[in-house]
Amino acid sequence: MNEFMKKFSLTKPIIQAPMAGGITKPRLASAVSNQGALGSLASGYLTPDLLEQQIKEIFELTDAPFQINVFVPLGLEMPPKDQIKKWKENIPLANQVNQFTSVQEEWDDFYQKIDLILKYKVKACSFTFDLPPEDAVKELKTAGCCLIGTASTVEEALLMEERGMDIVVLQGSEAGGHRGAFLPSKGESAVGLMALIPQAADALSVPVIAAGGMIDHRGVKAALTLGAQGVQIGSAFLICHESNAHPVHKQKILEANEADTKLTTLFSGKEARGIVNKWMEENEQFETQTLPYPYQNTLTKAMRQKASLQNNHDQMSLWAGQGIRSLTEEISVKQLLNQLCQEDIKI
């Protein structure tokens, strides 16, 4: 049993990725934790009240450790009005947006969620999109909470360790959903997972977790061999029975292959990997002109919600990683974890 597994008394070196947007509710996270892996709740897009409700619910479903993921606000000021106007004209239903969440409101939301993690003594807190502020890190570490950072390069991983993270998740470019990158990129700098793991494992003194494109036990075995102490998986859990993902989202993943996904900024203003649909194809020429996150995300929210209600995959954000060809049927969390952790996995 390695250091990562010992921290949480795990029997399986797996983290269920904290996928925001209502996918990873307590039912999924608790099912994962109850099978000896680390379940995750995603606080992104939840109000503090809803997060507290979900924390209470998961404690009713499991006594095992789980983590809560928190988006670190980027603190970007509102874009120019003419840019906003242009996108309002191009995005269905975007004219319903009369105001945006202020930077101060984002930080208030962040600290309210940190307070809930402290209040309920949650075992682990992970961060995405940036380095967490030092005061939050200090409070959480003083309370004995294990801190997990997200990085897409060795440089980012080292900064996460320096900030006080106990574990760093290495997100390869194959990963579905939003990129955790937070340093300015130098051209096309998305690093693949197999190149990232050994370099980061050599450079860091804390455990590293591999994330991106892994679907079966061969990927888990490869990541552990290269120096990771665990593996974080999203797409394979997204299609499990216990997942709250939209049925259309699940079906599109089961039908797709590795060439059907791409990185896009169109839905949120931040790079995220998803299955290509009509909205992405029709607006591809605007990829470099989107509003920054979270402003673009706010403008597309009503469109995405309506598409979800109408089962219209062409305007939904169908996040998925590059390993999806191997996903062919909806199974239970228990079945998936048994497949991921076969007997030849050496920990």
From Swiss-Prot:
Q: Tell whether Flavoprotein is among the UniProt keywords.
A: yes
Tell me its EC number(s), please. Answer: 1.13.12.-
Which residues are involved in binding FMN? 69, 171, 176, 213, 232-235
Q: Which cofactor does it need?
A: FMN
Q: Which reaction does it catalyse?
A: 3 propionate 3-nitronate + 3 O2 + H2O = 3 3-oxopropanoate + 2 nitrate + nitrite + H2O2 + 3 H(+)
Q: Name one GO biological process term.
A: response to toxic substance
One term of GO molecular function: nitronate monooxygenase activity
**Database matches in InterPro entries:** Aldolase_TIM, NMO
The record's listing under Gene3D superfamilies reads:
Aldolase class I
Note accompanying the cofactor annotation = Binds 1 FMN per subunit.
Keywords, A to Z, come to: Detoxification, Flavoprotein, FMN, Monooxygenase, Nucleotide-binding, Oxidoreductase
Which family does the UniProt entry place this protein in?
Answer: Belongs to the nitronate monooxygenase family. NMO class I subfamily.
What's the further remark here?
A: P3N is a potent irreversible inhibitor of the key enzyme succinate dehydrogenase in the Krebs cycle and electron transport chain. P3N has been shown to be a toxic metabolite to bacteria, plants, fungi, mammals or any organism that uses succinate dehydrogenase.
PANTHER family reported for this sequence: NITRONATE MONOOXYGENASE-RELATED
* Function noted in UniProt: Nitronate monooxygenase that uses molecular oxygen to catalyze the oxidative denitrification of alkyl nitronates. Acts on propionate 3-nitronate (P3N), the presumed physiological substrate. Probably functions in the detoxification of P3N, a metabolic poison produced by plants and fungi as a defense mechanism.
Q: What is this protein called?
A: Probable nitronate monooxygenase
